[in-house]
Amino acid sequence: MAPAVGIDLGTTYSCVGIFRDDRIEIIANDQGNRTTPSFVAFTDTERLIGDAAKNQVAMNPINTVFDAKRLIGRKFNDAEVQADMKHFPFKVVEKSGKPIVQVEFKGEEKQFTPEEISSMVLTKMRETAEAYLGGTVNNAVITVPAYFNDSQRQATKDAGLIAGLNVLRIINEPTAGGIAYGLDKKADGERNVLIFDFGGGTFDVSLLTIEEGIFEVKSTAGDTQLGGEEFDNRLVNHFVNEFKRKNKKDLSTNARALRRLRTACERAKRTLSSAAQTSIEIDSLYEGVDFYTSITRARFEELCQDLFRSTMEPVERVLRDAKIDKSSVHEIVLVGGSTRIPKIQKMVSDFFNGKEPNKSINPDEGVAYGAAVQAAILSGDTSSKSTNEILLLDVAPLSLGIETAGGVMTPLIKRNTTIPTKKSETFSTFSDNQPGVLIQVFEGERARTKDNNLLGKFELTGIPPAPRGVPQIEVTFDVDANGIMNVSALEKGTGKTNKIVITNDKGRLSKEEIERMLAEAEKYKAEDEAETARIGAKNGLESYAYSLKNTLSDSKVDEKLDAADKEKLKSEIDKVVAWLDDNQTATKEEYESQQKELEGVANPIMMKFYGAGGEGGAPGGFPGAGAGGPGGFPGAGAGGAAAHDDGPTVEEVD
C-alpha cells in the first residue's frame, strides 16, 4: 500500500508526519523546519508557499494570504468572518455568499476560494513528504478543530481533493493529540485524559478515555476563533496606541508598517514565554520614525487577561458533558503552540487544583503525530503493534436535527454522540391532506432553528391525502466517521423515499468546481516549475560569466593569453554582465542564448590557452572544465541547459 501521511493543517502553521518502521517521523521542509507557515503569496512573477511566502510578507502584505482556515466553510456574512477581515491586509470579497480572497498575481486580478488557498498549503506539505520519502504521496489524514461544523469539514476535505490527495479521514485535532499522547503511555486500566489544544487560530478541549488502545472521545468543546493570533492582535493594538501617543502618528492605515509590527509582536510573545520581558526595535517603522520599546510578561498577561480566562469555560463544559469530576482526570495534555504561554499552563494547573499538565508531546507536532498514526491504520498498515491495536471512537461536536412545526429544533443526534452513528425517528404531517413535507436539517444547540445552522433541506412529496398526524414519515440521520452526514426520509405508506448528502446547499464546491480547481492547481505548479528553471538559467549564465572573469584575472592565464583575445573576451563578459543587470526578468531561452553567445567567444580563446600548455588550467580550474576550484563552476551553468542540449560540448569534458 502506498504511504499515507498525517497532515495537521493549521491556521498559522502546518505540519506533516509519517508512520513507518514502527515509529512516527515528523518531516522537515526544504528550509529544515518541522512546521511550515500556512501562508501563500502571489507576486508579479511567481507564487510562494510556506516560509518563502511568510518571509516576504512585509514587502507584499496585500497579496500574501494567511488564515484561510478562518474563512474555510464559512459564509461571508458570518460575524467571525467580518471581524477577521478587519485584521486582514489582503482583500476578501463576497461571491454567492462565500468569502473569496482577491489578490494580484502576475499583473492580473485573481480570485481564490479559501479551499484553494488551503489546498496550496496542503500541496506544499505533500511535496515536503514526497521529497523526504522519494516517491509520490496520495493518501492523507487531515485534521480539523473538534469544533468545526459540517460545512467546515466538507470544505477541508475539498481542499484535500484540490491538492490531489485522497483524504482517508478528517479527524479532530485534540483526538489526534490524544493518540500521540496515548501511544507513549501503556498504562493499565482506563484513563481519563483531558486534551487542551490551543493553537494559532483555534481552541479545542476534548475529554478522552483511553483503555487498551481504545480511544473514546467523551465530550468536546471549543472556540474556532480563538488562538495565538488574538494575542498578537492585542499586542499590535497596544503598540499602535503607544506609537500614536509618543509620535502623534497613526500607523494603523499602513499595511507594511502593521505587518512589520505584527511580526515583531509575534516574536515578542514567543520570547515572553521564557523571559520576563523583551524589547522591540523596528527601524523606520512609519514615516521615518524608529520604534524602540519594551514589554513585560505581566503587561502581556494583562492585555490578554480576558482571552486567557475564556479558555476555562470550555474545560468546565467538557467535564460537565462527560459527567466527570475534575478530580477524576488522570492526565492533562497540552497541544498547540499557545499552550507554551506560562500563564495558560498555570491557569490549567490551578483549575485542576495544582495538577501539573503533561508535557511529554511536542505541542507543535502532536496533532500531526496522531494524524500519521491514524493514516497508517486507515491505509491498512498492520506491520506494527501500535497501529494494530488502536480503535478510535470520536464524537459529533454539535447536535443534529430537523425543524418541526413552529420552527422548533428537534435533535435526532445529540452533541457528543459517538460517531459513526445512525438514528431514525418517525414524524407526521401537520395539516390535513398535506401532500408533502419539507425536511430541513440543522446543527446547533439552540431550541429554535433560526438560531442554529441550516445544513440543507429537501422535500418528500406524493404523500396520499390523509388527516393530519396519520402519515408516517421516518427520518434517518447517518453520520460517517468524518463527521459528515447523510439524511433520508421514507413515507411508510407508499414507500416513497428521498435523501440528501449534506453538501451543496451551504456553499460546498461542486464536483465541476473541484475539477476546475485541480486543473488550475496543476497549471500553477507547472508555472512554479518553469519559474524555477528560468532562475536556474539566469544563475547559470551569471556564474559562468563571473567565473570566466575570475579566470581572466588570474596571473597565470593572463600571461599566456593574446592581448586582443583577452580584450575581446573581457568586453563580451562585460556586455553580458550589463545585460544581466538590465534583464532580471528575461525568459529562460534568452539567458540560454546569451550563454551560447558567450561560450562561442570564450571557448576558442580558452582552447588556445589550453593548447599553449596552460598547465591543466588555472588554479581555479577553467570554468566548465570540471568542477572547478574555489569559485569554480559545476558543469556549464547550474541551470544552463545550453551546454546539454546538443550533445556534449568541450567544456563538459573533465
Curated annotation (Swiss-Prot):
Q: Where is this region: Disordered?
A: 614-654
Q: Which UniProt keywords apply?
A: ATP-binding, Chaperone, Nucleotide-binding, Stress response
PROSITE patterns recorded for this chain? HSP70_1, HSP70_2, HSP70_3
Enumerate composition-biased segments (Gly residues).
614-640
Task: List the Pfam families hit by this protein, alphabetically.
Answer: HSP70
Matching entries from SUPFAM superfamilies are given as:
Actin-like ATPase domain, Heat shock protein 70kD (HSP70), C-terminal subdomain, Heat shock protein 70kD (HSP70), peptide-binding domain
Q: Which InterPro entries match?
A: ATPase_NBD, Heat_shock_70_CS, HSP70_C_sf, HSP70_peptide-bd_sf, Hsp_70_fam
Protein origin, superkingdom? Eukaryota
The cysteines covalently paired via disulfide bonds are none
Single GO MF annotation: ATP binding
Which family does this protein fall into? Belongs to the heat shock protein 70 family.
- The protein's name is Heat shock 70 kDa protein
What is the source species? Trichophyton rubrum (Athlete's foot fungus)
Q: Which gene encodes it?
A: HSP70
